Amino acid sequence: MLAALVAGAADADAASATAGSGAAATPDRARYDVTLRSDADGAHWTGRERVSFRNASAEPLREVYLRLWGNGEDPCGTSGAPSPVVVSHVVGGTPGPLTVDCTALRIVLPEPLARGERTSVAFDVSLTVPDRNARFGREGASRFLGNALPVLAVHDAKGWHLDPYVALGESFYALASDFRVRLDHPSALKVPATGRTRTLPGAPGRTVTVSVADRVRDFAWAAGPFRTATRTTPGGVLVRSFWAADTPAAGVELTRTDAVASIDRFGQEFGRYPYGELDVVMTPEFGGGMEYPGLVLIGTTEEGGAVVHEVAHQWWYGIVGNDEYSSPWLDESFAQYANFRFQGWDTNDCWSDVYWPDDNATLTASMAYWSQQRGQYHLVYTAGPCALADLERTLGADTMARLLKEYARDHWYGVSTTEDFVRAAQSMTDVDLGPFWEAHRIR
């Protein structure tokens, strides 16, 4: 995400969870089968979602949690304005009350799920797009459905990850999963989405957009009377562009050009883009940009937008995953470092320009910290890439390039941590990098 950094943040206190003895992240190998139907303008979607999953932990899995991130801005709503995301008619388990400001739903399984076994839960889902310009929101006739679809929470050695929603950045932590999604909508609406998409005729005046997405961490889509164009990159990636009619034409062209160039370049630097298709959605007033697997939302002016940063997120968060609440620098700083290099910006002295609010502040702080220091959150986008640029100068450009490509390979579709990266970097040199990490507040 690259935003104006002026949004308000939700509560910073993470929900407590008891750590279990089974360290493997679970439930894993999830598959989501979703069928939704929209109203006339794409602002309301209803249907059914089924998710099957495996227990990867050594411990029996007795429950799962759904994250209803779309409720994050509105928590539990009011009697006159209920929460935007509603789950009902659950089968395959017994639902409890909503918790964590109505962003978490516990479902107790009928019997403990042993290691390696699979089961599924299914439920009705209702999504009402909020009246705000945001990743789950709207702008004019455009509808954005980012983080709208309920997804499984993750349990690992730290317990269940039930962190609060933050508007300032991201709270999201998900394992790579498969999605099969059918979106039934008026034919006047174009519906870009995560995955490889195709359209089928529906009822009179309606179209069904069908998407298949494998090994992705989330599923997002947009809907609107978009103008469209497609390009295939020299590397073979289909880039589909969608833009609102009032988006500046010059900015649209710049954004499309940068999307095509950056996805191929990052494929060479970090590993070939595996999803085949990227949808780029542009509107004139969207705040900055927001990344999802195979889909980016870009606020686009005459000068273009933050598309290069968001394309870089396809690797740093999408392919190489991380817990975005506990370690936001692992995706934001890495994506911005890739952006700096793509743009050719001079980073020789940028670390010396960094101002830290206090001696204890660290680049590797969690969103619990940044939510309380909103004016300093820009450091993830400024100090972070500067630190990585300094690491490049310390290791040498060729070694840094090899580090990132091998690091991406070793964590492809997995989850990375700061400790993983520190170990990987140290393995590339005989020089003790301890003083480097300390000086750059990577702790």
What are these regions (language model features)?
Residues 37-41, 412-443:
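Beta/coil-rich, acidic/histidine-enriched accessory regions frequently appended to metallopeptidases
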Residues 69, 121-220:
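Extended, low-hydrophobicity, Ser/Thr/Pro/Gly-biased non-transmembrane segments
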Residues 171-308, 337:
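Hydrophobic helix-coil surface modules that form long, contiguous segments used
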Residues 80-141:
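A surface-exposed beta-strand-loop module
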Residues 326-397, 405, 411-412, 428, ...:
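Acidic/His/Gly-enriched intrinsically disordered linker/tail segments
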Residues 1-46:
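N-terminal, polar/Ser/Thr-rich
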Residues 282, 293-352, 404:
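Zinc-dependent metallopeptidase catalytic helix centered on the HExxH motif
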Residues 62-95, 146-149, 184, 188-189:
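Solvent-exposed beta-hairpin/edge-strand motifs
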